[in-house]
Amino acid sequence: MRRLRRLAHLVLFCPFSKRLQGRLPGLRVRCIFLAWLGVFAGSWLVYVHYSSYSERCRGHVCQVVICDQYRKGIISGSVCQDLCELHMVEWRTCLSVAPGQQVYSGLWRDKDVTIKCGIEETLDSKARSDAAPRRELVLFDKPTRGTSIKEFREMTLSFLKANLGDLPSLPALVGQVLLMADFNKDNRVSLAEAKSVWALLQRNEFLLLLSLQEKEHASRLLGYCGDLYLTEGVPHGAWHAAALPPLLRPLLPPALQGALQQWLGPAWPWRAKIAIGLLEFVEELFHGSYGTFYMCETTLANVGYTATYDFKMADLQQVAPEATVRRFLQGRRCEHSTDCTYGRDCRAPCDRLMRQCKGDLIQPNLAKVCALLRGYLLPGAPADLREELGTQLRTCTTLSGLASQVEAHHSLVLSHLKTLLWKKISNTKYS
């Protein structure tokens, strides 16, 4: 006990010599004040972090609500039994950034998975007691009893046309939706199966996953229960989280965070491989089977990579179909182009005369991605590559004009960038 008291005295009253303390009588008081201020500030940070965590991370609520409706026979799905009866879905780390969209890493049948579930309807504290009935009424209200399979097919086709555009490939996508709904392969779609698939289609990211299932760089869909779904896990998560503790991130200025990411993140050749994958993903979004898609929040936070440094788009929430963006922007009232913004950075020009937004975006996906890559690839780049890489990235970043009118130049710049990076890492262990 004597040693503990001595240690506390040294911490609280500062390890200065008695002579110095005698010369500066106010120093002891200041040290006590600063020590307790540090304790208070640390306690406050811990409190804020964990109160924020409890609000953002509500996976238990999601599971309770989903399983309640599964047991009532309202919903169905390929992972319902494993989730609610066999308890084979293990919820691990919370990755949610907003309360309404729950994201967890997990384990299912010995596979690393990402678990995603929306709980917007349950977050109102006044309505928590009747959370399950509200989701039954609000989210799982369609199709209604008595709907034929033909009517459900037409209903699905109409929904996809509204969100992806009137494309000749949509009937094939409707076929995929119906095959997915019939998860037990009994050649019929029950009302619970139809309600579950319809609810999933209302989730923007699920619609994108379905549209991009054939693409190499989108996460693969593994199963669902109601509007909860599992995708393959992304072992190394997003770039922004590279070994930075959650409590430390808000305290560090962006410049210092960037420096730490370069120091703690992958070696430059691995970063080049990830960047090539991101550029290939930009190609996949441009005039694919189900139309063109826009990246409307172009940040490294949405990007992930596998254990072998193959790029995977970890979060598709802010990727939007061209038809959806056009519908949002066309005819919208505006004073400046900033009023014509979908998501974070999908911006269209403002017609000052008509005071209405136009439907075409100003900046293509590639220009926004290249702006990210300048900060990610140039630091630590090989000396013999840095100048040419910097020039090409600057050229790419300045791509302008309406996104629908830069196709040829877009493809040429993208091809040059991929070739430059690939030549540097090909025939090495990094390729």
UniProtKB/Swiss-Prot annotation:
<feature type="topological domain" description="Cytoplasmic">
    <location>
        <begin position="1"/>
        <end position="30"/>
    </location>
</feature>
<keyword id="KW-0812">Transmembrane</keyword>
<keyword id="KW-0735">Signal-anchor</keyword>
<dbReference type="Pfam" id="PF12260">
    <property type="entry name" value="PIP49_C"/>
</dbReference>
<dbReference type="GO" id="GO:0005789">
    <property type="term" value="C:endoplasmic reticulum membrane"/>
</dbReference>
<dbReference type="Pfam" id="PF14875">
    <property type="entry name" value="PIP49_N"/>
</dbReference>
<feature type="disulfide bond">
    <location>
        <begin position="62"/>
        <end position="117"/>
    </location>
</feature>
<protein>
    <recommendedName>
        <fullName>Divergent protein kinase domain 1B</fullName>
    </recommendedName>
</protein>
<keyword id="KW-1133">Transmembrane helix</keyword>
<comment type="similarity">
    <text>Belongs to the DIPK family.</text>
</comment>
<feature type="disulfide bond">
    <location>
        <begin position="57"/>
        <end position="94"/>
    </location>
</feature>
<feature type="transmembrane region" description="Helical">
    <location>
        <begin position="31"/>
        <end position="51"/>
    </location>
</feature>
<keyword id="KW-1015">Disulfide bond</keyword>
<keyword id="KW-0256">Endoplasmic reticulum</keyword>
<feature type="short sequence motif" description="May mediate ER retention">
    <location>
        <begin position="5"/>
        <end position="6"/>
    </location>
</feature>
<feature type="topological domain" description="Lumenal">
    <location>
        <begin position="52"/>
        <end position="431"/>
    </location>
</feature>
<keyword id="KW-0472">Membrane</keyword>
<dbReference type="InterPro" id="IPR022049">
    <property type="entry name" value="FAM69_kinase_dom"/>
</dbReference>
<dbReference type="InterPro" id="IPR029244">
    <property type="entry name" value="FAM69_N"/>
</dbReference>
